[in-house]
């Protein structure tokens, strides 16, 4: 299988060993993320073993698998935190993730949310979104620049999207757990990512919060590509058209939720039935 760059005949430019992020993400072939034959070892342990998968532009994909299956390491490779021993990782057609650093990958349009929410608890919901919106301008600009009308409108849109418009002035530290998760998702969205990586986003949520989160993710698909790592099978079933099952660092099965649930290999190693 040819990588996106070889298919398009394009490459990432370099300058003195420093990778230059292309100005525009190329999704012309309809693929947002492309991993092929990725391998990662830690002290002899094979965390990722010949892993290959692709995520279409605008797709909402759920990743499931037992502990130690390689889910976190896979996201570390995508975000540049971990360098693979071998393999290919492309964002769109031209961005070779294996040759980019973490800040470059984030700037290129890949946003990651960890399981535990990290918000500025002493600041209001609105201020958290404002800081996220200005983050690319540098710390001094973020602290002292005034919001433009367009930026204020964008924050209002985000507040409505994450359903926190009535709590805009509340300190983030006083929010419920689920509300903090939504706020952090809003902060990610403020940076206009094309690909969102979401690690167990509904862990610790109430049933009502989980349902709201499902609605949010479904509404984001299309404009954004989403990769959701989750253990809550009911939640996965409510949002996923396609599920990838990881086991021992490789793709064990892939398809619709019903197909995956009835796959004998998945039943044996993961679902326990």
Regions found by a protein language model. Give the residues of each.
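Glycine-rich phosphate-binding loops of nucleotide-dependent enzymes
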Residues: 7-273
